[in-house]
Amino acid sequence: KPLCLEQQQASELVNLADSTGRILMVGHLLQYHPCVNQLQELIRAGDLGKIFYITSNRLNLGKIRREENALWSFAPHDISVILSLMGNELPIEVHCTGGAYIQDGIADTTLTTMLFANGVRAHMHVSWLHPFKEQKLTVVGSDGMLVFDDTLPLPDKLVIYRRNIAWLN
């Protein structure tokens, strides 16, 4: 996460894996999580109606790193899940801002917004400078909302809220 920073490096790794009979893959562990799989199925089936927005928080206190910032360390997990929930469509706009509070030039916290062609916005907050651990992804749609809280035990990790939007005239 990421596999590498340049396409040439990726090609070399693919060739090396092919020549040695090895499997090469990026460590997007959440792609195989049963709750993420259920989230994908519910969205594909239209159970949430029109998706309005997605939020994700991956926050904790520490481990402070010197070789990478919080975005590189934490966000690949959430980005991979958000992209899969959006049918692997790439965003048409990405905005990211962050703050380096502990070490100059190494962001401890970042806020990222991604806009997709269908109007869905995804908001992502990652930080290793936060008082408590939070690993939560929320999907809000016109016919329901889902919250995936990866800090809870498995039976409680995924909660579906069936509340429709009531429009005022």
Task: Please provide the spans of the model-predicted regions.
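Beta-strand-loop-alpha-helix segment that lines the small-molecule cofactor/substrate pocket
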Residues: K1-Q31
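Rossmann-like dinucleotide-binding domain that binds NAD(P)(H)
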Residues: L61-F132, K136-T138, T151
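Hydrophobic/anchoring residues in structured secondary elements
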Residues: Y53-S56, E93-C96, I160
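C-terminal glycine/acidic-rich active-site capping loop/insertion
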Residues: L29, G141-N169
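Basic phosphate/pyrophosphate-binding loop/patch that engages nucleotide-derived ligands
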Residues: V14-I23, N37-I51, A117, V140-M145
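Alpha-helical elements of Rossmann-like donor-binding domains used by nucleotide-donor carbohydrate transfer enzymes
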Residues: E12, Q38-E41, V81, L111
